[in-house]
Amino acid sequence: MWFRNLLVYRLTQDLQLDADSLEKALGEKSARPCASQELTTYGFTAPFGKGPDAPLVHVSQDFFLISARKEERILPGSVVRDALKEKVDEIEAQQMRKVYKKERDQLKDEIVQTLLPRAFIRRSSTFAAIAPSLGLILVDSASAKKAEDLLSTLREALGSLPVRPLSVKVAPTATLTDWVKTQEAAGDFHVLDECELRDTHEDGGVVRCKRQDLTSEEIQLHLTAGKLVTQLSLAWSDKLSFVLDDKLAVKRLRFEDLLQEQAEKDGGEDALGQLDASFTLMMLTFAEFLPALFEALGGEEIPQGV
């Protein structure tokens, strides 16, 4: 159980949670299949295991792992448009009259309702870790929309959820640009070989570099010309590597082999034990990594009144 992406949210108040109350709350918002006329459903599922008895909350030390599933019927717009055009053409030809917007919209709704039961279903899951002792919720996603879907559903389940995206005092682009310009990152962080450079003008250019020496003259010339680093690949303390963007999204997380081998050793031969060990080790690593990252980026910004 290793997260591949990371969006970090700060709890703005103490969250009094225990496994039983969280399990009960999530049960009120459990995932279910789409009914024949439903476009989408969203709810919580067991992060580990299957079946109705699998718990919706996995607890390890003082960390809670949860998972949400979105189920949606895929109805391509082109299919609806083609069916609507065919119906409109048929009415206009048979009844010798024009079909106007109000009737056209009604026909479209009828077509959607007819096609929905036969539409393909797509399912996707999003994992999150709640760490009350750290005051954080960590979502395994690079999409703010997916993270907000999970958090808003969790808020509905709990009744309230005092949380906000974590922010830092210094603009991330300024720090990342400085690291590439000076060829040195702060603390135990090391610049790797990938970055994205953007012009400061609204319609300015974008340069994406992969497997490239970021200390090269070419990169430095872009920085001298005023481009800013908006995405940068980094390594931390020989434990993990990742790509950080200007919104503080951590992408393409990769945990080093030593950590994964340790989790395999701790988990034993049982599949659930392996998942639990990897989740625990991941969260203990995050407990060190995230404070170090935000300190290196200038320190966490605490909004006034919070």
Curated annotation (Swiss-Prot):
MF terms in GO: double-stranded DNA binding
Keyword Cytoplasm: yes
GO biological process: DNA recombination; regulation of DNA recombination
One matching Pfam family: RdgC
Superkingdom to which the source organism belongs: Bacteria
Keywords noted in UniProt: Cytoplasm, DNA recombination
Localisation: Cytoplasm, Nucleoid
Coiled-coil segments: none
HAMAP family: RdgC
Job of this protein: May be involved in recombination.
Protein family: Belongs to the RdgC family.
Protein name: Recombination-associated protein RdgC
Species for this entry: Pseudomonas aeruginosa (strain ATCC 15692 / DSM 22644 / CIP 104116 / JCM 14847 / LMG 12228 / 1C / PRS 101 / PAO1)
